[in-house]
Amino acid sequence: MTPTRRVVTGIVDGIDVLESDGPAPNSLDIGPVAVSEVWWSERGHRTVGDPCDRTTPGFPLEPPPGGASARIIRMPGIPDGADLDSTWLRVDGDDPSTPGMHATDTLDFMVVLDGSVVLGLDDGERVIGPGEYVVQRGTRHRWRPADEHGWTYFVAMLRPDPTVSPVDGSVRVHSTGDAPVRRVITGAPVLDGAAEVHLANGGFTMTDMWHTGGPLRRAAQGGDPDGPWALEPTAGGAWFRQWTLEPAPPSDAGWHRTRTIDLDIVLRGRVRLDLPGGITTDAGPGDVIVQRGTDHRWTALGDETLVVATVMFDAVW
C-alpha cells in the first residue's frame, strides 16, 4: 500500500502554517497487510502543538493510559479456496477456540474507507461496508474480510486513564435515530442502525457518532450528546463525527478556529483547505489532515458531495 498522505497544520511563532504534507513516516508493510500511523499521543492533557509521531520503535497495539493512536490499515481479501475460519485476523493473546477474538483496553473509533469487513462479536457477525462506522468499547471482537477483495479502514484507539476525575459531559445513552449514516456500537446490547444526532445547515451536515463526555476513564464511557449542539468537545474529551459539505464557491463565513486537534479523513469527494496568508492544499479520498488549532476553512471541490470522518480531541493552546 502506498503510505497514507498526511497533511499537518500548526502554529509556529503565532502564525498558522502548513507544517508537513507527505507520507506518514511511521508506516509498515507486513506481507499483504499495510499500516500507516497518522497520529500518536502519549497523554490525555493535550496541547495543539504536541508532536504527531511516535519516536519509540515497534507498533504497539495500544497507546499508553490517557494516550491515543490513529492508523489507516489495509487488509487482504479472502484467498481462493480458503476456509473462512482461517481468515480471521489473528492477534497476540487472542482466544484460540475462537480465532482472532480479543479485547483491548481502548475505546476505538473506526470507519471503513473501501471494501467490506465482517465484525465478529459474542452475539454474532455483522458486515461493515464503505462509509459505515463502528464504536468499539473494549468488548470482545474479531475481524475478517467479507469477500475476495481487500479492505481499508481508519481506526483511532483511545486508552482510558483510570486516574482522571469523572466529568459530567452532557452525554446520554446512545440510541438509534434517523440520520442517513450507519453506526455499530458494541456493548450489551449491541446497537446497529442509523446515528441519532444529525445537524443540517444549508449545504453542511454534521452527524455525531460518539462523545466521551470528558476525559476518558473507562473504555465504555460516553454516548450521544445531550443539550445544545456544540462544535468543540467537553474539556478533556473527544468526539467522533462525520461531516459533509456541498460544492460551492469559497466563503469568508467559513473561516473558523477551534481549540482542538482534529483528525480529518476524506471518505468521498475532494476538498480544499485554506489557511491564512494564501496557504492552500487539496485533498481526496484516503488523505488525512491533522488540523491543530489553526484558523482555516474548507471548500468542497468538483460536483460531488464531500464526506469527511473526523475525531476531535480537546486541547489547550
What label would you give each PLM region?
Residues 97-99, 105-122, 259-276:
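Glycine- and acidic-residue-biased ligand/ion/polar-headgroup-sensing regions
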Residues 30-66, 73-76, 206-236, 241-244:
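Extended, compositionally biased flexible segments
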Residues 116, 140-142, 270, 295-297:
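Structural motif
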Residues 1-51, 171-220:
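N-terminal leader/capping segments at the start of a protein or of a new domain
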Residues 122-138, 277-293:
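Short acidic-glycine-tyrosine-enriched beta hairpin
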Residues 108, 133-142, 148-166, 262, ...:
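A short hydrophobic beta-strand segment most commonly corresponding to one strand
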Residues 15, 116, 193-194, 270, ...:
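Residue-level signal for well-ordered, solvent-exposed loop/turn and beta-edge residues enriched
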Residues 53-56, 68-104, 138-140, 160, ...:
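Conserved short histidine dyad/triad with adjacent acidic residue
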